[in-house]
Regions:
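Surface-exposed loop/turn segments and immediately adjacent short secondary-structure elements
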Residues: 2-146, 152, 156-160, 376, ...
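Conserved polymerase palm-domain catalytic core
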Residues: 218-318, 326-333, 352-356
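Short, conserved micro-motifs composed of acidic
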Residues: 262, 348-373
């Protein structure tokens, strides 16, 4: 693993790849801020406002724990410690996970004692409730704070307890989540949903059915989770009080700071949201989103696509939700229900990023969102006609771009031919073949793929 990491770094150096540092950002009035102190102050204001708790929503917890969960075992701590990924940035305490893994049994004993103390008292060390937020740019204007997502760096020691807590929660979560939710679930991934949407479109075309899609985008979904509503949802879904109380106390009095290239802000309180970067966040958000869909009545709704006696009207991957129906009216009905229930728990639809796609005629379109003929669905291009040729062409172009970017590597006489071949197989072919499980490949596309592979080897060998 270490050699692979070193090779990756050397490739970046040879290619001259570098990540642009955050420059100026805009203040409330749209003026550029260039001074480090001003930028830090702006990030402090933005994140404090983003994670501010709603004052009208007090915590009504009665503090009664009815059933206690079994104590934490040393073998659980050992498993959790060994499963933490190495070479990851440390949290606020600055302690790398490699230190705990070097100490082995000594670290296991100490961490087991701390975890068991938390398990019995429900009180977390304050250091374990602190996060360092790293703003990561998304699409859009990089001078707007809202176009960044904040990734949380947390203490590696706390990850041991969080992994154990997640493992205890998982059995309940798996029981509650439906088959249409593939986000952060074992054995499921983005390619499953890509295949599902392609097969649904294929069946609709086979039986001459029109199909209408709405690709929903939430504004800051993970950051807007209301904690008190979350605890209520966990209780309704049968999560044991013991686990809920541990989660409640973990999220109580949480603190964070924002770290950028311009420095680190002061610590501030977090009153809502689940941190992107925390082990538990995907699991908790999936339950939060499931409550929205249940209250919207999607499972009982008649609207949707009927396949093999089953009605399918949505596909989900965490917060990314795709609604589908056989008519405009049905789709609008589904969307209104989801929008209403989402707003009840503090989530708002991002209308600017919401897309509508239809394989049939549009007569009286009354749904917010941009109407499109194609959509990038979890990295794969889906077109209204269900044709895969557009995606195959796009993948081949992306592969060519990667291959061209590696030219300086292929020209190097210091790198052996077998290593160059491995680089093509590891860095180029996976880009081209992403989502290929669901492709319908015609003869023309087959020839195109073969020609691309031949082009790669010729370029590698410098054959004109």
């Amino acid at each position: 693993m270490g050699k692979t990491r070193d090779l990756s770094e050397k490739i970046k150096d040879t290619k001259g790849t570098s990540h642009a540092k955050m420059g100026s950002i805009k203040d409330r009035n749209g003026m550029d801020l260039t001074e480090a102190e001003d930028i830090k102050k702006k990030w402090q204001e933005y994140t404090e406002e983003l994670y501010k708790k709603h004052l009208h929503n007090p915590d009504n917890h009665d503090g009664v724990i009815t059933d206690l969960e079994p104590d934490i075992l040393e073998c659980e701590v050992k498993w959790a410690l060994e499963s933490i990924t190495t070479n990851k940035a440390s949290g606020g305490d600055g302690i790398p996970v490699e230190l705990f893994q070097i100490l082995k049994d000594d670290a296991v004993k100490v961490l087991h004692s701390i975890c068991q103390q938390i398990w019995k008292t429900y009180q977390w060390p304050q250091d374990w409730k602190r996060s360092v937020f790293i703003p990561m740019p998304k699409k859009g204007n990089a001078k707007e704070c809202s176009n960044y997502c904040t990734i949380a760096l947390i203490s590696h020691a706390s990850k041991v307890m969080l992994k154990i807590l997640q493992a205890r929660l998982q059995q309940y979560v798996n029981h509650e989540l439906p088959y249409v939710q593939a986000g952060f679930r074992k054995g499921r991934g983005t390619r499953d949903q890509i295949a599902n949407i392609r097969w649904i479109m294929e069946k609709a075309r086979e039986f001459l059915k029109n199909i209408y899609f709405c690709f929903i985008d939430y504004a800051k979904a993970f950051d807007c989770v209301d904690h008190n509503k979350l605890w209520k949802i966990l209780k309704e879904m049968g999560i044991p009080d013991h686990l809920t109380c541990l989660l409640r106390n973990l999220y109580a009095s949480q603190e964070a700071t924002v770290r950028t290239g311009h420095g680190t802000t002061d610590w501030f309180q977090i009153g809502k949201g689940v941190c992107q970067g925390c082990i538990l966040s995907p699991c908790l958000f999936n339950l939060y989103a499931e409550d929205i869909m249940r209250n919207a009545g999607l499972e009982e709704a008649q609207a949707g696509i009927k396949i093999a006696g089953r009605n399918i009207n949505n596909l989900r991957y965490a917060d990314d939700t795709t609604l589908m129906a056989e008519s405009e009216e049905e789709l609008k009905s589904l969307l209104m229900k989801v929008k209403e229930e989402s707003e009840k728990v503090g989530l708002k639809l991002n209308i600017q990023k919401m897309k509508i796609m239809a394989s049939g005629p549009i007569t009286s379109w009354e749904i917010d969102g941009e109407t499109v003929s194609d959509f990038i669905f979890w990295g794969s291009k889906i077109t209204a006609d269900g044709d895969c040729s557009h995606e195959i062409k796009r993948r081949l172009l992306l592969g060519r771009k990667v291959m061209t970017n590696l030219d300086s590597i292929f020209k190097s006489r210091d790198i052996t031919l077998p290593t160059k071949v491995r680089l093509v197989k590891a860095m180029v072919f996976p880009v081209v073949m992403y989502g290929c499980e669901s492709w319908t490949v015609k003869k023309a596309e087959h020839r195109r793929i073969d020609a691309f592979e031949l082009w790669c080897w010729r370029r590698l060998l410098r054959v004109p």
